[in-house]
């Protein structure tokens, strides 16, 4: 469960390394977001010379959380870190590579391009 002011690692090569959540999209009083949800973030740290700069406000989709996610068949899946992928306004990823595994719920949430770039979909 990701809430306002949570820090997430960036799982793509857009240039940002870490982001902080400013807002959870999807409701006026929404407190938490999970895998597949869109969030608005501020970049905490970025690689030098990248297009994405520190302090820039960006949109991202959550791809990994440390909180377990219950699936329809009763199984649970959780990851060792919280991570997000930066996206453009048309829900396509800003980077050209995705690092680490992602949950298959990302594809079901309408982010098929992110799922196709990922090295492993769990």
Curated annotation (Swiss-Prot):
PROSITE patterns noted in UniProt: RIBOSOMAL_L14 (PS00049)
Origin superkingdom: Bacteria
SMART domains in UniProt: Ribosomal_L14 (SM01374)
Pfam families: Ribosomal_L14
Gene Ontology cellular component list: cytosolic large ribosomal subunit
Lineage start: Bacteria, Bacillati, Mycoplasmatota, Mollicutes, Mycoplasmataceae
Keywords for this protein: Ribonucleoprotein, Ribosomal protein, RNA-binding, rRNA-binding
Name used for this protein in its record: Large ribosomal subunit protein uL14
CDD domains: Ribosomal_uL14 (cd00337)
């Amino acid at each position: 469960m990701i809430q306002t002011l949570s820090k997430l690692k960036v799982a793509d090569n857009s240039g940002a390394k870490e982001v902080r959540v400013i807002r959870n999209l999807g409701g006026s009083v929404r407190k938490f977001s999970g895998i597949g949800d869109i969030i608005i973030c501020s970049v905490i740290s970025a690689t030098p010379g990248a297009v994405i700069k520190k302090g820039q406000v960006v949109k991202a989709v959550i791809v990994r959380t440390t909180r377990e996610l219950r699936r329809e068949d009763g199984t649970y899946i959780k990851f060792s870190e919280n991570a997000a992928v930066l996206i453009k306004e048309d829900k396509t990823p800003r980077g050209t590579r995705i690092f680490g595994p992602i949950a298959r719920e990302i594809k079901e949430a309408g982010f098929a391009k992110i799922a196709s770039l990922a090295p492993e979909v769990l």
